[in-house]
Each structure stands twice: as C-alpha cells, then as structure tokens.
UniProtKB/Swiss-Prot annotation:
Purpose: One of the primary rRNA binding proteins, it binds directly to 16S rRNA where it nucleates assembly of the head domain of the 30S subunit. Is located at the subunit interface close to the decoding center, probably blocks exit of the E-site tRNA.
PROSITE patterns in the record: RIBOSOMAL_S7 (PS00052)
Species: Alkaliphilus metalliredigens (strain QYMF)
Keyword tRNA-binding: yes
UniProt keyword annotation of Secreted present: no
UniProt GO molecular function: rRNA binding; structural constituent of ribosome; tRNA binding
GO biological process: translation
This protein's name: Small ribosomal subunit protein uS7
Keywords: Ribonucleoprotein, Ribosomal protein, RNA-binding, rRNA-binding, tRNA-binding
Length: 156
C-alpha cells in the first residue's frame, strides 16, 4: 500500500485491429520481456486459426472463452483464533478478468502442441467449448469455495 495516497490505474488502450480492451490485455499477458510485437503476432495468429477452424468471429469466440474461464468465487486464507480458514469470497469484476487471462496464458504455455500460436488457438477454442485446463482451474476454484461455504461468516 502506498503511503502517499492512491496511485491512479493506468488505462490500457484498445488493440488496434479489433478495438477490444480485453484483446489488448491478452496481448499484454502473452508478452514476455517487453516484446509486444511478438505477442501481437501470437494473438493475431491464434485469432486467424480460430477464424479458419471455427468459422466465427474470433473476438466473439475469445469473449465466450473468457466468460467460461472467469471465476465468480474464490477462497482467501483468514486466520481466526490460531487456525487458518479458507473463506469463500466473491471476486471483483476486474480481478475476474485478470484471473481469467492469467489462467488462460498459464495453461496455454503448459500445453503440448508445437508453437505458441497453435497452443493459444486451441486453448481458446477449448475454453469456448467449456473444456480445457483453464476451465478446469475455474471449476476447481469454485469447488474449493463450495467446500468451504461453512466458513463464509468469517468474511471481512
């Protein structure tokens, strides 16, 4: 926490081709070592593959995938009387999007296909069809929250 007041959030500019803020954030999540051009090539290449295979607008497929990945609930550790409890809490909309993108990129990198473009395209299509590792992560998070529902009264 900063001592001198709140630091204003920097706005992310919409991506130049699709005009979408979420796509711009995906590009920033994929980016490594400040190589934005490479990240854009990966994302736009994956969108081309999605357009080819799904024969739909790739941005709509991506947004559908994001809706399937974004968690509604998560658990947060809370110490009460010497014991740690996993307390289920609702996820703020901004954090939902951030977690969704983070999980999408993490499980994309863990896939077995050759080339990041192919991996990203397949992970997005899997997520849009409610399958894939990133959707499983969301379901596991929700199961964890459901299992710890008894501790919901410890919310702060």
């Amino acid at each position: 926490m900063p001592r001198k007041g709140n630091v204003p959030k920097r706005e992310v500019l919409a991506d130049p081709i699709h005009g979408s803020m979420v796509v711009a954030k995906l590009i920033n999540s994929v980016m490594l070592d400040g190589k934005k051009g490479t990240a854009q090539n990966i994302v736009y290449g994956a969108f081309d593959i999605i357009k080819e295979r799904a024969e739909e607008n790739p941005v709509e497929v991506f947004e559908k995938a994001m809706n399937n990945i974004m968690p509604v609930l998560e658990v947060k550790a809370r110490r009460v009387g010497g014991a740690n409890y996993q307390v289920p809490i609702e996820v703020r909309p901004e954090r939902r999007q951030t977690l969704g993108l983070r999980w999408l990129v993490k499980y994309t990198r863990a896939r077995g296909e050759k080339g990041m473009i192919e991996k990203l395209a397949k992970e997005i299509m899997d997520a849009a069809n409610n399958t894939g590792s990133s959707v499983k992560k969301k379901e596991d998070t929700h199961k964890m929250a459901e299992a710890n529902k008894a501790f919901a009264h410890y919310r702060w």
